[in-house]
UniProtKB/Swiss-Prot annotation:
Organism of derivation: Bos taurus
Listed Acidic residues bias regions: 174-183
Function, as annotated: Protein kinase involved in intracellular signaling pathways downstream of integrins and receptor-type kinases that plays an important role in cytoskeleton dynamics, in cell adhesion, migration, proliferation, apoptosis, mitosis, and in vesicle-mediated transport processes. Can directly phosphorylate BAD and protects cells against apoptosis. Activated by interaction with CDC42 and RAC1. Functions as a GTPase effector that links the Rho-related GTPases CDC42 and RAC1 to the JNK MAP kinase pathway. Phosphorylates and activates MAP2K1, and thereby mediates activation of downstream MAP kinases.
Active-site residues from the entry: 388 (proton acceptor)
Region (Autoregulatory region): 70-140
Protein name: Serine/threonine-protein kinase PAK 1
Needed co-factor(s): Mg(2+)
Cited SMART domains: PBD (SM00285), S_TKc (SM00220)
Amino acid sequence: MSNNGLDIQDKPPAPPMRNTSTMIGAGSKDAGTLNHGSKPLPPNPEEKKKKDRFYRAILPGDKTNKKKEKERPEISLPSDFEHTIHVGFDAVTGEFTGMPEQWARLLQTSNITKSEQKKNPQAVLDVLEFYNSKKTSNSQKYMSFTDKSAEDYNSSNTLNVKAVSETPAVPPVSEDEDDDDDGTPPPVIAPRPEHTKSVYTRSVIEPLPITPTRDVATSPISPTENNTTPPDALTRNTEKQKKKPKMSDEEILEKLRSIVSVGDPKKKYTRFEKIGQGASGTVYTAMDVATGQEVAIKQMNLQQQPKKELIINEILVMRENKNPNIVNYLDSYLVGDELWVVMEYLAGGSLTDVVTETCMDEGQIAAVCRECLQALEFLHSNQVIHRDIKSDNILLGMDGSVKLTDFGFCAQITPEQSKRSTMVGTPYWMAPEVVTRKAYGPKVDIWSLGIMAIEMIEGEPPYLNENPLRALYLIATNGTPELQNPEKLSAIFRDFLNRCLEMDVEKRGSAKELLQHQFLKIAKPLSSLTPLIAAAKEATKNNH
């Protein structure tokens, strides 16, 4: 007798799918207006110079320009000078005065209303300052957090902001800095890559900020004749700090040779299969001949890496931070002009595919949150802040395993610097203290986890369809975002979200504390994610 009837009856129901995919650019008719990432990035004027310098580094016989370089007089960079910009706000007219033209253009197209500007002009300036620091360039982000044995290659920006009525200043702000970009208005920040199959194949990335050092303070401006109340005033004082010397290409290559493994990876790995091509290189899957383990190998042409010195940090630190909930670094090799980085491979793709294509229940969301909190508790206990928690950076195994990846914005906290202030990450997931340029600690990751939980509920983070600059303003001023249908959530889930999305950093839960939250006790087995992963993979395949 045939068992076909039984087979059909026993087959589990298909996972609930979203009526329309929330994936930006995945066949949406509105993709053209929402997918800012599809816009071409501006050309990098320094790319040719950097390539030429790198060619000279790896080809010692090339001395074409050395004589000319020697003939040039050495002129040191200016130091200890100040550039003061006065930006005022007239409460009567509702207009900013003395605002740089670049900022004025950004504000004009930001969709931040006049009433919103009048309500909180300081927040407007905060987000303009932040947005300007997030210039998009053709740069790759690396796992650039530092450990005690790795040199800090990041230049430092200092930012102090105080309101007219206040005397204390906000703690200093430190930003990563590149040395060759005066900057034009940046293109709109992409909400997320057009289609995230896996972060291994992701080519749309948020770069590290490239801005001059700023020291910003506020002071009153002269009131208008007919206005008895002085308007809010903001004086921006910019002081150029000395930059740390950058490593030469020769030094970078020498250091890399001392770090990477010796030998031919083509003998250690077999069955190479190309799975992705990005701006920084090509990604393959391969098989470890000795163990049979499937791995991901990213092959990067060093000539095309704009911040080669950060690769050293990446490798040094990745091998120091291994955890079951982190996509682990396995090995690295120099092969000709290429750096090969071998990583753990997860075939299930990113959590983004699941949240945009399927509907997760609370038990499944709790399981993902638990795994992410375990990764964060490990990182935070090792003084590492991830700074870019979002669904794109969570990889899934076909067995339902959940692992955190993409440490390009990580920061190491030293005892001397218990809080960081670098403006990095992806705006829609950012904590308010980051957007408003305050010093921050590991709990910025907890806020981002809360936003990611909203992603799992609604398919996208709050404000994703807003102009990015207005989204930053809303994050800075609205506080905890509102859910579309909070009544559909259990009380313990709402409490978990409130603990993650607490504006007061002191009251916000830590990773260690939240691992004890009652919400995680309803977590389903990780295997419950497998049908969602399979359904999402099928849906994304059909969207291509």
